[in-house]
Amino acid sequence: MRMIDIIEKKRDGHTLTTEEINFFIDGYVKGDIPDYQASSLAMAIYFQDMNDDERAALTMAMVNSGDMIDLSDIKGVKVDKHSTGGVGDTTTLVLAPLVAAVDVPVAKMSGRGLGHTGGTIDKLEAIDGFHVEIDEATFVKLVNENKVAVVGQSGNLTPADKKLYALRDVTGTVNSIPLIASSIMSKKIAAGADAIVLDVKTGSGAFMKTLEDAEALAHAMVRIGNNVGRNTMAIISDMNQPLGRAIGNALELQEAIDTLKGQGPKDLTELVLTLGSQMVVLANKAETLEEARALLIEAINSGAALEKFKTFIKNQGGDETVIDHPERLPQAQYQIEYKAKKSGYVTELVSNDIGVASMMLGAGRLTKEDDIDLAVGIVLNKKIGDKVEEGESLLTIHSNRQDVDDVVKKLDSSITIADHVVSPTLIHKIITE
């Protein structure tokens, strides 16, 4: 088999066989196939697309290029959730203990954040003593006993994806549905998930700006999952404004605690219940989404979800008293109110810009080596659709420096107040095929 034949076949719009896809991935990881041929094939895929079988084959070739995490010693259906990323996305912190409280095992592998705010691990490390460096045996034991544990990413998972992603990044082939879908799904499958729930974001703060693109990606990933024996569902949710009210690590953790108490922001609570219901159904703990939702609401109202979060924190060395004493979380030195310059209704909160403003305060990383300030960030006091009076606080800046003129300047261009009301949509669609 020759790589040039595979490139020409895809260039001319033909379907690649599983053997041809395996030959490419295997050769590329070993270094037998050079970058210039790999980038040529990526560009051919970009223009000619791939059918469902090709996408499934590409995903599994990337899974098989490295280690797979074996979670077979964990009892029950392991359901993993993936979000395509957004600003103030606190869902994992709420979802993990919430679905664990209704007996769904959550064996979560999470990373650190690059960009706007920290990843799930950074947020959890705002709790004194919390650590994710646990060995596989302890990880399995914790999930079997308490239904939830979080571990840092380790091992040689999907090396083909890492190599191909770096190449796509510099060759103009990032925005290709088959390449994005196989990249995301290969990581989830390699991490040992039996079933997968996907939160595909759309809007100004999302990777997929249009609903049409988000739908195409959601369908692609759901079909890949179902074609390779992993039951998969997706929802398309809105990222035209940050989710919830908090952007920043300790601030988002506080918001997660409030949500588990039943006192969280409406949009975050709704998204968590929608995603959680799918996880419960896929784990065979409820027949219908309605039944699953009722179980989750009961777990919040009874305090079971919050109790589960406490045990989870304690199991991983953290100080679980922060749940009842949130003032023990890292606190910023200054709280600065950002006030409305006129009266009206909030019509725009540009997610990316608000995320960048939070990063300027120190809440996110520009490079992997950067330190994160866990205490700082932004709390939105108004969301899209809310009425605001001139001089009223739109948001609160939590900062460890007094001079935040650069942050204020960034925020000036990211908030729009007009005289008409805009009603945001949170969940656009649920995709099951």
UniProtKB/Swiss-Prot annotation:
For this protein, the record's Gene3D superfamilies field holds: Nucleoside phosphorylase/phosphoribosyltransferase catalytic domain, Pyrimidine nucleoside phosphorylase-like, C-terminal domain, Transferase, Pyrimidine Nucleoside Phosphorylase, Chain C
Task: Please indicate if the UniProt record lists RNA-binding as a keyword.
Answer: no
Enumerate the UniProt keywords alphabetically. Glycosyltransferase, Metal-binding, Potassium, Transferase
EC annotation from Swiss-Prot or TrEMBL: 2.4.2.2
Cofactor comment text: Binds 1 K(+) ion per subunit.
MF terms (GO), sorted A to Z = 1,4-alpha-oligoglucan phosphorylase activity; deoxyuridine phosphorylase activity; metal ion binding; thymidine phosphorylase activity; uridine phosphorylase activity
Top-rank EC class of the record's enzyme: transferase
One GO term under biological process is: pyrimidine nucleobase metabolic process
Q: What is this protein called?
A: Pyrimidine-nucleoside phosphorylase
Its taxonomic path starts at:
Bacteria, Bacillati, Bacillota, Bacilli, Bacillales
